[in-house]
Amino acid sequence: TCMACRVRRLPGLAVQCTPVVCLPIPVSRSEVPSILVLPSPFFTETDTIRLLEPEDCDTQWVLRQVLSGAYDKPFVIDDGTTRTLHFSLSLIQSSMSLKDPFALELDYTQAMMSFQLFLQRPQHILTLGLGGGSLAKFCYRHVGSARITVVEIDPRVIAFRDEFDVPRDDARFRVIEGDGADWVIKSGEWDDKPDVIMMDAFDRHGLSGSVSSTAFYQSVYDALAGRGVMVANLAGEKDDRAEHLAMISEVFDERVLSIMLSDGNDIVLAFRNPSFNPRWREIGNTAKALRTRTGLDYPKYVQRLERSRRLRYL
């Protein structure tokens, strides 16, 4: 760490220090994006902000853009304990504990893992939206030998993957730059269709337009394996969430469960299997076993999911 300006050097980057700012300079790898690390103007003096900006940018102008909400790129804030990905200051898109990078910090990410109550050994998980990689990392560590494909449309989000300890691509794990809606259609043509499709596809304006139609949800249904599950994080205005819930219910013939979270997110599980009929006592036992293995409070999600089934939330 540079003691003069409190900026941490990043792996693969040399740092040219001045009395005002540290400017990261790519080292011999042109494909490595320039990540500018500055003292954060928002919180405490030990916080930093990471920006995808060139070394010769006007840093004061950039920070004013961030503060005003006009900045149109993702950025990362680090307080020494937690690292968060933002599309704006008003909303945390992803959060990572620096002590435990593979833990799920946000309630909605924990709730999205409730698909394991119904499908414990998926072979292939397709995730739409990388963010800080929280879901992908957790699945990589805790969901058996499942192959994980992550599709992210914004290369600027992918550029931060190392900041969030997202695993390198290997035989089980890969991150692809592309439109999630297009990849859902492609996956429907694969021999090994995904057992789980996780949808967390947001930009700074909310749910991506390409995943906001009945046709998209029909393509998800068609792409899933026979007993497959779609898990969707719906956030934003109540009317928008209700519209998505209605589309999902129509396509999946009301085989839908939901978890309403206090932060305004709705986590929706939709089941392709026409014979879907949950056995809640068995699911409760599964939840206890999963809690022991992963540390997540699956039993509380069983209660909420069963309640949504009884009340026919949609």
Model-derived features: where do they sit?
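Cysteine-centered motifs
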Residues: C2-C5, C17, C22
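Basic polycationic patches enriched in arginine
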Residues: R6-R9, R29
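The AdoMet/dcAdoMet-binding core of the Class I SAM-like
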Residues: P24, P33-S34, L38-P41, T48, ...
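SAM/dcSAM-binding transferase cores
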Residues: S28-D78, Q93-K99, N265-L314
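A short, flexible beta-alpha/helix-coil linker loop
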Residues: S90-S94, F202-H205, M230
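Alpha-helical subdomain
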Residues: L207, V211, L234-D240, E250, ...
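C-terminal substrate-binding/active-site "lid" region of AdoMet-derived donor-dependent transferases
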Residues: T214-N277
